[in-house]
A protein has these predicted regions:
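Conserved metal-binding segment of the jelly-roll/cupin
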Residues: 104-127
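Non-catalytic, conserved peripheral segments adjacent to functional cores
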Residues: 1-107, 128, 135-183
Length: 183
């Protein structure tokens, strides 16, 4: 796994750019190798679950996290393009309430590592997008939490062309001021 690791303004959140080998036939890249991932990032956490989601244009999912059994997520897009966001919700962190966003797509092949202690969300920019993500803990619906996507406490600059398509759960997300967050 040949990978450029890009630090972000949020400690622990990484953008990963794989080396892609391409020619007239197509392309190849190693999307995950546990040993190389640990060597290059310093993260030696086992992944226990892979998830695959598909979303239509304008769908906004988030901002999600699990308050117990928190999940680190390694995210990549295999179809289309999304604007992917991580928000620091660790109250003791110097970057508490800060966010980072980047475009992930099947074209740029970038990946984002979001460690436990962060909320995650994304907006689908293309007609459809499919996301694959690995998690460091199992899905536990009883611990799932949601912070409202447009909370002014964050001021996330979503690249929206109108109102997003939201699930009932995401419409009912808490404000940061009322949300259960990490110490």
């Amino acid at each position: 796994m040949s990978l450029q690791v890009i630090q972000t303004s949020l400690a622990g959140v990484l953008i990963l750019e794989p080396k892609v080998f391409g020619d007239a036939r197509g392309f190849f890249f190693e999307s995950f190798n546990a040993r190389r991932f640990a060597e290059l990032t310093g993260i030696n956490t086992p992944f226990v679950q892979d998830n695959h989601s598909r979303s239509a244009k304008g769908v906004l999912r988030g901002l999600h996290y699990q308050i117990k059994q928190p999940q680190g997520k390694l995210i990549r897009v295999v179809v289309g393009e999304v604007f992917d966001v991580a928000v620091d919700i660790r109250r003791s962190s110097p970057t508490f309430g800060k966010w980072i966003g980047t475009k992930l797509s099947c074209e740029n092949k970038l990946m984002m590592w979001i460690p436990p202690g962060f909320a995650h969300g994304f907006l689908t920019l293309s007609e459809a997008a499919e996301i694959l993500y690995k998690t460091t803990d199992y899905y536990a619906p009883e611990y799932e939490r949601c912070i409202i996507w447009n909370d002014p406490a964050f001021g996330i600059d979503w690249p929206l062309a109108g109102e997003p398509l939201l699930s009932p759960k995401d419409k009912a997300g808490n404000a940061l001021s009322r949300a259960e967050v990490f110490p």
